[in-house]
Amino acid sequence: MRLGYVTHSLRSCWNHGNAHFLRGVLRELIAKGHEVEAYEPSHPWSVQNLVEDHGEAGLAPYREAYPELRSRTYEDFLELDLPLSNADMVIVHEWNEPWLVAALGRKRRRGARYTLLFHDTHHRAVSDPEAIRRFDLDGYDGVLAFGETLAEIYRRWGWGRRVFVWHEAADTSLFHPPKGETERQGLVWIGNWGDDERSAELETFLLRPAQAVGLPLDIYGVRYPDGAQQALARHVA
C-alpha cells in the first residue's frame, strides 16, 4: 500500500502530542513493507516554536529516533497534489487548515483514485462542534475518530458506518519501561497546560495529591503561563 499522511508536523511535537503516535504508526507501516510519505507545511507553528525555544538542535532527537521517517514540505496545494496522486490511501489530520481539507475533498470528488480519510484526534466535535463544522468533508470516504464518544458524534452527523475508532497509543518501540530495575523516586508529569482546559483536573488529581504525600514532582511541557507556573510553585513542582 502507498500511504500519504497529511499532518500539521511530523518533525515537531511542540504542543503537538499527536506527532508521537503518528511517528510510531508510520514507522510500523514502513517495517511491514508499505510505502509511506508524510506531508506538512513548510513552516508549521509547532516547528517554529520548537526552534524558537531550542534552536535547530531541537529537531535532532526526532531525526535520531526515527531515521527512516521523513516528511515532504509544501507551500501550496499544487506542491501537495502531484505526489499524492499516486497514493492508495490519504489520511488528513484535523490540525490542518480548513482550505486544505476542503481542497483534498474536492480532488477526491473529481476522481482521485485514493481512499481519503479524515483523522480526528481532538475533542472539539464534542466541546466546540462549530469549530469542526468549518471543515468541508464532502468527498471524504470516512473518518478515523480517536474514541467511541467522538465516533458517535460523527455518526449523528450522518457518517454512519464510515466512522472507525482508532485509539491513540504510545509507540512502545521508543517509549517503554527501563529494561533493568533502577532506583525510582518521585513523580514525573509530561504534558502541556492546555489553555486552562484541564487546570482544575491537574490541581485535583496531580498537584494536590503529590503535595499531600510529600512526593517530589517534576513537570515537563510547554505553554505554562505565569498563573500556571505560580500554581506549580505553590505545590513545589
Q: Which residues does each PLM region occupy?
A:
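Nucleotide-activated donor-dependent transferases that construct or modify glycoconjugates
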Residues: 1-15, 42
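Active-site regions of enzymes building and remodeling cell-envelope glycoconjugates
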Residues: 53-57, 140, 160-163, 229-237
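Carbohydrate-associated surface elements
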Residues: 149, 166-169
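Extended catalytic core of nucleotide-activated donor transferases of GT-like folds
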Residues: 9, 23-24, 37-154
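A short, glycine/small-residue-rich beta-strand->loop->alpha-helix junction that serves as a flexible
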Residues: 9-21, 196-200
